[in-house]
Amino acid sequence: SYGLALSLISYYVMAGYVNLLAALLSLAGIFYYVIFYSVLLKKATVQNIVIGGGAGAIPPMVGWAAATGHLGLAAWILFAIVFMWTPPHFWALAIVRMKDYEKAGVPMMPVVHGEVKTRRHILIYTIELVAVTLLLPIFNLAGTVYLVSSLVLGGFLLYAAWRVFKVGGNKVAWTMYR
């Protein structure tokens, strides 16, 4: 009831002092995470992290809506960036904590499909993530500094994902997670 009360208060504060779109998105994000992801998905499917990634991708949209009052293409690209980042990030953690997830009955990818398949998926999603980060400059929604930063940081991330894929093990997966 405490969480529900805070959620409702945050909605009314956001609606009253910011704008209705940001408030509704915030409420949708809370519902998505608490009900859809935590209660319904987390222990129901190996795709929990992929589908649940939407919950973590909503806050940038809330911020965008709060600042602009609408959702433009850039907001949706930010959503896509966080959405695509979530699986490789948490699958790397799931490799390291595989026994804990198995004991808790959470069907994370390494528990259900093994480390090798998970490592392959980490690499695939990381390639897709780096591609999505380039959409902002492609659509002239970000400048040269962002483009160069995305390429350099994306290169580091791809290297980390490649090492997870080729080398494997907890130490390499932990580096990818961090």
Predicted regions and their residues:
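Solvent-exposed interhelical
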Residues: S1-S10, T86-L135, N140
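Transmembrane helix-loop-helix
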Residues: Y2-T45, I124-Y177
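Small-residue-rich segments of transmembrane alpha-helices in multi-pass membrane proteins
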Residues: G3-L8, I51-A67, V116-K117, Y177-R178
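Internal alpha-helical transmembrane segments of multi-pass membrane proteins, especially GPCRs
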Residues: A28, I51, W76, A80, ...
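Alpha-helical transmembrane segments and their lipid-water interface positions
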Residues: Y37, G63, A92-L93
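A cytosolic-side transmembrane-helix exit/cap motif
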Residues: L41-G52, G69-A75, I95-V106, F165-W174
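Hydrophobic alpha-helical transmembrane segments in multi-pass integral membrane proteins
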Residues: M61-A74, L129-P137, R178
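Alpha-helical transmembrane segments
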Residues: H70-P88
